[in-house]
């Protein structure tokens, strides 16, 4: 353990070839005590109150004065006191200039980092001086100071990281600062150059490395004039410095994981947008044969008997026409949404439709008017039938011809109306539908007004007018 010490006295300034032995050294110290060391007279407790009562205007003269016997004060000496700093400066410097140890060079070559000495290792505190003042004359006092036993510090092995030892700051008196400064002005050690070349950290010598605690000194001082004090100071044994082994490998620091940014995968295919369903226009298929529409039962179905031939007129075709008209009026509201796409029909087409409607009205048979009147005014027809007692004679040929003519005109009228409706649906024209409705109404009006091409001379004029 002694090999870990570093040479600390080879290049100190002012040493020369001086070698200090390890044995005790006796130093003669002359101390001139200051007059302040004498015990000062303390005031008696009653004096303060007595003085206050004396100065008070409300107290009687000499009422609270208490005479106390004060101890005689120590004689004041004319000699100037010698500060303790001068005393310490005379014997402190040769103590710290110790001989270098041979083991420091070997420890620096082996790559071991020597610990740095702190102020708390060898601080001599002046506050621990115990000075006994005795009134004897011409006395020689020998003071022997025994150092504390050496502290063996443990060997610290640090594998991952070097331990950071924070020294505890020791209070340094102002008196020590006055004489401690020339001690620290030492020359650099010879072992530092070798350790720096080999990559070994050399210990730094701070002010606290070689401060001798004055608190360990016990000095008996006699206040007599020309007193000679002999102080023998034995230096403390060398402290065994700890060997700190630091591995070359530094602790592996795990880096913090980098924040992983979320990766958003965007598919190349665009989202399939479902188109809105287009408004489906109703398509009405008109067959060649008339659609069978079940009409609402009329309250009274007229039965006309002509010469033992019973002819029952069924208002099927007229009801179909009426229902188509209502369907056209209902679909008129649905065709408003497609009004922007409707082109105005050509005048030739509208005139053609009007001509077809006029032809259908002219071809209509008088039996259609009878059927319409029977469906619209059943009560009147039944009343008129009841009034006619004699049965009119109608030729069978005229009757059959009229029936077939009415049926053919009705079929043609249905075809024309269906064709106009289909044209209106295909073209999406609202005007075409209105023209169809108007033509149907005109057809009904013409049937009601005139019987058309009826060749029967024995027709009841009153019924026709009705």
From Swiss-Prot:
Gene disruption phenotype: Single gene deletion has compact clusters of magnetosomes instead of magnetosome chains; precursor magnetosome vesicles and vesicles containing immature crystals are throughout the cytoplasm and no longer associated with filaments. Cells have substantially decreased magnetic orientation. No change in location of MamK. Single deletion slows recovery of MamK dynamics following photobleaching. Deletion of 3 consecutive genes (mamJ, mamK, mamL) leads to cells devoid of magnetosomes or a magnetic response.
Spans annotated as Required to restore magnetic response to deletion mutant: 25-80, 375-432, 426-466
UniProt PTM comment: Identified by N-terminal sequencing of a protein that is about 96 kDa in size. The protein runs anomalously on protein gels.
Residue windows of the Tandem repeat unit repeats: 81-168, 169-256
Induction remarks: Part of the probable 17 gene mamAB operon.
Main localization, broad class: other
Ranges of the Glu-Pro-rich motif repeats in the UniProt entry: 145-164, 233-252, 253-272
Cellular component per GO, a single term: magnetosome
UniProt keyword terms in alphabetical order: Biomineralization, Magnetosome, Repeat
GO biological process, one term: magnetosome assembly
Region (Disordered): 1-23, 60-80
Keyword Repeat assigned: yes
Domain of life: Bacteria
Cellular compartment(s): Magnetosome
Region annotated Not required to restore magnetic response to deletion mutant, chain positions: 1-24, 81-256, 136-334, 333-374, 432-466
Domain comment in the entry: The gene is quite polymorphic, the central region is subject to recombination between internal Glu-Pro-rich repeats. The polymorphic central region is not required for function, small segments in the N- and C-terminus are however required.
Subunit note: Forms homooligomers. Interacts with MamK.
Record's function text: Required for assembly of magnetosome chains. Regulates the dynamic behavior of MamK filaments. May connect magnetosomes to MamK filaments. Moves from the cell poles towards midcell; movement does not depend on the treadmilling ability of MamK, suggesting MamJ associates and disassociates continuously from the MamK filament.
Further details from the record: The gene is quite polymorphic, the central region is subject to recombination between similar Glu- and Pro-rich repeats. This bacteria makes up to 60 cubo-octahedral magnetosomes of about 45 nm in diameter which contain membrane-bound crystals of magnetite (Fe(3)O(4)).
Record family assignment: Belongs to the magnetosome MamJ protein family.
Protein name (Swiss-Prot/TrEMBL): Magnetosome-associated protein MamJ
Organism: Magnetospirillum gryphiswaldense (strain DSM 6361 / JCM 21280 / NBRC 15271 / MSR-1)
Lineage: Bacteria, Pseudomonadati, Pseudomonadota, Alphaproteobacteria, Rhodospirillales
Encoding gene (name): mamJ
């Amino acid at each position: 353990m002694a090999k870990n010490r570093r040479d600390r006295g080879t290049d100190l300034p002012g040493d020369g070839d001086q070698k200090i032995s390890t044995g005790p050294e006796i130093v003669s110290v002359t101390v001139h005590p200051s007059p302040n060391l004498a015990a000062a007279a303390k005031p008696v407790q009653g004096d303060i109150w007595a003085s206050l009562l004396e100065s008070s205007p409300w107290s009687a003269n000499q009422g609270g004065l208490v005479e106390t016997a004060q101890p005689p004060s120590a004689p004041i000496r004319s000699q100037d006191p010698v500060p303790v700093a001068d005393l310490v400066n005379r014997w402190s410097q040769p103590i710290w200039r110790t001989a270098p140890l041979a083991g420091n060079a070997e420890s620096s070559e082996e790559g071991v980092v020597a610990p740095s000495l702190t102020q708390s290792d060898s601080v001599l505190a002046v506050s621990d001086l115990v000075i006994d003042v005795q009134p004897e004359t011409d006395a020689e006092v020998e003071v022997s100071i025994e150092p504390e036993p050496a502290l063996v510090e443990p060997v610290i092995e640090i594998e991952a990281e070097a331990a950071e030892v924070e020294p505890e700051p020791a209070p340094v008196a102002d008196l020590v600062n006055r004489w401690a400064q020339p001690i620290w002005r030492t020359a650099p050690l010879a072992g530092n150059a070798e350790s720096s070349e080999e990559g070994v950290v050399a210990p730094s010598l701070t002010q606290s490395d070689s401060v001798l605690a004055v608190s360990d000194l016990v000095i008996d001082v006699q206040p007599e004039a020309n007193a000679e004090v002999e102080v023998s100071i034995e230096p403390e044994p060398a402290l065994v410095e700890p060997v700190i082994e630091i591995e070359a490998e530094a602790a592996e620091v795990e880096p913090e994981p980098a924040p992983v940014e979320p990766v958003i995968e965007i598919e190349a295919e665009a989202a399939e947008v479902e188109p809105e369903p287009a408004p489906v226009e109703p398509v009405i298929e008109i067959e060649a044969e008339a659609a069978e529409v079940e009409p609402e039962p009329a309250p009274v179905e007229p039965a006309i008997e002509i010469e033992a031939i019973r002819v029952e007129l069924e208002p099927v075709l007229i009801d179909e026409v009426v229902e188509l008209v209502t369907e056209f009026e209902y679909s008129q509201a649905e065709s408003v949404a497609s009004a922007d796409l409707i082109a105005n029909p050509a005048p030739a087409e509208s005139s053609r439709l009007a001509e077809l409607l006029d032809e259908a009205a002219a071809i209509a048979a008088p039996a259609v008017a009878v059927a319409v009147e029977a469906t619209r005014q059943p009560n009147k027809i039944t009343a008129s039938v009841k009034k006619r007692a004699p049965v009119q004679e109608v030729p069978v040929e005229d009757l059959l011809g009229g029936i077939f003519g009415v049926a053919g005109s009705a079929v043609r009228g249905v075809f024309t109306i269906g064709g106009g409706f289909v044209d209106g649906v295909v073209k999406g024209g609202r005007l075409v539908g209105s023209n169809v409705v108007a033509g149907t109404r005109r057809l009904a009006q013409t049937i009601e007004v005139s019987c058309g091409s009826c060749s029967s001379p024995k027709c009841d004029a009153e019924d026709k007018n009705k």
